[in-house]
Amino acid sequence: MSRMNWPRVATAGVLVVAGVMGSIVASQRTASAMATSANALLKSLDPEGRKKLALPLDSSDRTRWNFVPTSMFPRQGLPLKEMTEPQRKLAHELLRSALSDRGYTTTTAIMNELEAILRDTEAAAREASGRGSAGGQVRDPELYFFTVFGTPGEKAAWGWRVEGHHVSLHFTVANGTSVAAAPSFWGSNPAEVREGPRKGFRALDKEQDAGRAVVMALDEAQRKTAIYTETAPNDIITMTAVTTDPLTPEGLTYSAMNPKQRELLMALIDVYVSQMTADIAAERMAAIKKAGVEKLTFAWAGPVEPGARHYYRVQGPTFLIEFDNTQNNGNHIHSVWRDFANDFGRDLLREHLAAVAH
């Protein structure tokens, strides 16, 4: 190697090291914020509340998850309903430690506004039908359960989740520097509020619009490839599986798209990635690019017209996004982010335990 190339190589090396160190520092920042918030919430509770909130890291309940109402799926953990107002604020600080501003706004809109709208809408429908306003599913904005698994700390492996109807977010932390944030589920019923003071409100508007933008940007031949079936599935395909393998390759590849279409596909992925803190989002996007964007696929099921029942998914070597809007006559969304290696921090915990063993 000539002397004149040394500075260039040295500079590249510095940039690589800086990038790695920046990622570690960023992850450490999020992990530290999570631990601080979780410990503050734990400290605020009496023994009975702490017993509900805190479970061992190896609890079988850590990977038991769902997105249906609690009346259909009894949950462990401490619900907002049983917290004092100061404790609720601490629980929300924990939620904020993991999410971007948009992610927090989306999540709390589902928890608060949509549950209340659904409760009132269903009660009015029952009363109009002569069944009375009582009965049906319990729709309660305070029935969202927080659970901490293990002991939050700088060197510890631990995790936490928040879950209730249409929200199921899972986080695993190891060594105080690494965070896995999957699976992540958000739902919206209705997808669009059709009446009342909040008419027109859509909690998951970006997820819906960005997906449609991709399929509508395709030419006729590309669309025939992307739409792998004319009938959308009744729900997300992976449902509440603990682990998820890549689904059968369907749809149009990134390589078969033009530059504008590729830009729209990456923008769609970013909608999901950017629900998390900037640190987590940057790591997710870096992992996607490292695995090869040319391996990404976009698949659509059902009609493309607005209001029709439809489904789409984006899949890469490391992750899967599913979006389904088929229930309630095409006005009820389920969406999920799955990580093939790190749902519930599977690989993260394996690496942590291997390091501790040595």
Residue ranges and their predicted role:
Residues 24-358:
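A cross-kingdom marker for long, charged
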